[in-house]
Amino acid sequence: MRRLTLFVLMVFAGTAAGRAQGTSQGTSQGTSQGTSDSDVTAKIVAMEHMWSQAYVLKDPKALERILDDNFVNVESDGKLMNKADMMAEVRASTILQVLTESMVVNLHGDTAIVTGIFLMKGVERGKPFAQRERFLDTWFCKDGQWVTIAGLVTPVGE
């Protein structure tokens, strides 16, 4: 089984208390009109957290609500994954913990760009692993609901 990569949080709004904070830059307008930047940021951070927890809890239904039907992710090995691929990956997850750091939410009207770093730990083929990656997620407010339309993960050093 291939090493699971989470872009998240994966990921990545933080599974540890106090790590589920993101900073906000930019302005929110359009369909998110009437909602403050901090409210939008908090909502997106919460959904990022839900996304990373989906891997720990093996809960693909969480991704059903978060990922757009046309979602695309570029994995750290260059592989492209769609929504169905991501949901299958969650069902087979061996991830035990996901932590995030340096998460920033940039708001641009009905679009939000989220960047950060996540560390995931788990067991693969009976051996423990730890993986640290930078992520970039693109969120879009579609019909009044924020969904992720694209993601990218890339390895980073310790």
Can you annotate each of these PLM segments?
Residues 21-158:
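A beta-strand edge to alpha-helix "cap/lid" segment located at domain peripheries
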Residues 10-18:
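Hydrophobic h-region of N-terminal signal peptides that target proteins for export
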Residues 1-6:
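Bacterial N-terminal signal peptides that target proteins for export
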Residues 7-10, 80:
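Hydrophobic transmembrane signal anchors and adjacent membrane-proximal interface regions, especially
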